Amino acid sequence: MEKIKEKLNSLKLESESWQEKYEELREQLKELEQSNTEKENEIKSLSAKNEQLDSEVEKLESQLSDTKQLAEDSNNLRSNNENYTKKNQDLEQQLEDSEAKLKEAMDKLKEADLNSEQMGRRIVALEEERDEWEKKCEEFQSKYEEAQKELDEIANSLENL
């Protein structure tokens, strides 16, 4: 009788332990899903920035084209040569700066894509692990109920004696 009580207590403790693990895994899943959502939002933000930078690059390329035309005209007008050359240099620097910003944004976007993929794989793995734990928890619950039923039968048979 004492062993059965100990076994019951052991099963209860084990069941509680599994329930705690299940709750921990459920919380981790929520955190990962939230992190994934944040990463997706960051990707959207970076995509918008990327589009904005693309627009700026096109604008700057257009400005650069205009500047080059002015530079050709400035060869005919020596007095304006210094002004056009300086403007051309400034626009080229802006273009380089924009290209650097675009490259940085693209790198961040690639990194965010990788992080998003990694988080997705991690979520899938955690969901599979959660499913395994839920299955084990159900098995332990079933075993607990069987043990409880056996204990009740033993108690009834002892009372009948």
Curated annotation (Swiss-Prot):
Chain coiled-coil ranges: 1-161
Chief place of localization: cytoplasm
Gene Ontology cellular-component terms listed: actin filament; actin filament bundle; actomyosin contractile ring; cellular bud neck contractile ring
Biased composition range(s): Polar residues: 62-83
MF-aspect GO terms: actin filament binding; actin lateral binding; protein homodimerization activity
The entry's keywords: Coiled coil, Cytoplasm, Cytoskeleton, Phosphoprotein, Repeat
A Pfam family recorded for this sequence: Tropomyosin
Keyword Coiled coil: yes
Span list, region Disordered: 32-97
Positions of modified residues (Phosphoserine): S55, S116, S157
Keyword Phosphoprotein attached: yes
Localization per Swiss-Prot or TrEMBL: Cytoplasm, Cytoskeleton
Bias (Basic and acidic residues): 32-43
Domain of life of the organism encoding this protein: Eukaryota
Transmembrane parts of this sequence: none
GO biological process, one term: cellular bud site selection
Known role: Involved in cell morphogenesis. Binds to F-actin and stabilizes the actin filaments.
Miscellaneous comment: Present with 11100 molecules/cell in log phase SD medium.
Record text about domains: The molecule is in a coiled coil structure that is formed by 2 polypeptide chains. The sequence exhibits a prominent seven-residues periodicity.
Assembly information from the UniProt record: Homodimer.
Name used for this protein in its record: Tropomyosin-2
Source organism of this protein record: Saccharomyces cerevisiae (strain ATCC 204508 / S288c) (Baker's yeast)
